[in-house]
Amino acid sequence: MWEAIKDRETGRIRSNSFANRFKSRRILSLQLSNRKDFVSPHRGSVNSLQVDLTEGRYLLSGAADGSAAVFDVQRATDYEASGLIAKHKCIFTVDKQHENGHKYAISSAIWYPIDTGLFITGSFDHYLKVWDTNTAQAVVDFKMPGKVYRTAMSSMAMSHTLIAAGTEDVQVRLCDIASGAFSHTLSGHRDGVMSVEWSTSSEWVLYTGGCDGAIRFWDIRRAGCFRVLDQSQTQLGFRPPILKRTAVGSKLSSVAKSSLGGQNRLKTLQSKQTGSQSVKGSSSAKASVEKSRQKRIHPGMLSTLDRATAHYGAVTGLKATNDGMYLLSAGSDSRIRLWDIESGRNTLVNFETGRIQTNKGIQLDTSDDPALVFVPCMKTVKAFGMWSGRTTLMLRGHYESVNTCCFNSNDQELYTSGSDRQILVWSPGGTVEDEMVQDEVAEDKDNWSD
């Protein structure tokens, strides 16, 4: 550690690489925190977690008992064990006893991306509600045609305040906070929509995953989806071609090259004669193929591409990377796939097998450096390498199925919740405070041996 600090002072390593090195070291040492504890007020499984995008300080949770709570991640409300364990109780909670509370389970709870003055909850009681954080009162509500599975708002929107809602209905609805009405609906799925995710590179692009196994890309400024992901369409044909000159070919003698020169000249003369005839035919053929492709991809026409599937089952989770280049998806077939957003192709990253819940949606999250994917896998949380698919971390601590993963990039902490009604904190191990505690414990020990 001190050597790295010295290298940073002398200029041997840059500041960003120095910070990334320590962040990656902290993330790879995540373990169940013995210094921070959230006191959960929920009496049902916790289905949603999110840290606010402005300060990274307030944690919002939604549970199956119809309650939503807000926690302060940085400031503890109480201390135990001589100040070693920080207890974080909720700042306030909204439950069924509230006059505007939800009657049934809350499936999604998200922050308003601009500030912490508003938050949004979606419930199985067919309502989506917008809450004022300061007064804990519902200011806007939207009546949905069915159970609300997932809600999302764009973190980079400057021209709209739309909430995308995925319900058990086949249509995705966009709710406008400013007008208090539905902006428009997106039709294309053949079953309920279990996951929605906004693009991190464009405020107009929305990704949806349905129970029909399809992942659709929408531009909300136009009618119809402009892309349907197909798990059989891979990047194999889009990779750079193999170089013709190999190591063996480069060792050919000059005599052999000269002998082949005459044959190559004859071939070039023949190709010039036949090339002029074939160019016209090939150009017309390419044009016809491109026209047919455009016709098939057109959103208003039914085709085989429109019925493509990304998973053999429902799409239970979606997560776009922070750079906006890749999309992660999880399905009820217990598969995780990484998609290239620009081409819409499967990158064929082979994530190691793990059981994923099939009857409800899950919440994925990612870290940038190192590039990890945190996935709820039944009672455990697995961190996969985004490019290798290998299991880097396996976190055990929940007694029942894990529903959500929420990574706090400011403190390099991971928050998870499950059907055991608990919210657990996973913090980096090997910190200076942990070493001090170990030293104090070692001083209290005697020197007697057994």
UniProtKB/Swiss-Prot annotation:
Localization annotation: Nucleus
Record InterPro entries: G-protein_beta_WD-40_rep, Rad28/ERCC8/Ckn1/ATCSA-1, WD40/YVTN_repeat-like_dom_sf, WD40_repeat_CS, WD40_repeat_dom_sf, WD40_rpt
GO BP of this protein: DNA repair; response to UV-B; transcription-coupled nucleotide-excision repair
Stored Pfam families: WD40
WD repeats: 41-81, 101-141, 148-185, 188-228, 310-349, 397-436
Function: Involved in UV-B tolerance and genome integrity. In association with DDB2, is necessary for repair of UV-B-induced DNA lesions.
Subunit record text: Interacts with DDB1A.
Protein name, UniProt field: WD repeat-containing protein ATCSA-1
The organism's taxonomic lineage, starting at the top: Eukaryota, Viridiplantae, Streptophyta, Embryophyta, Tracheophyta
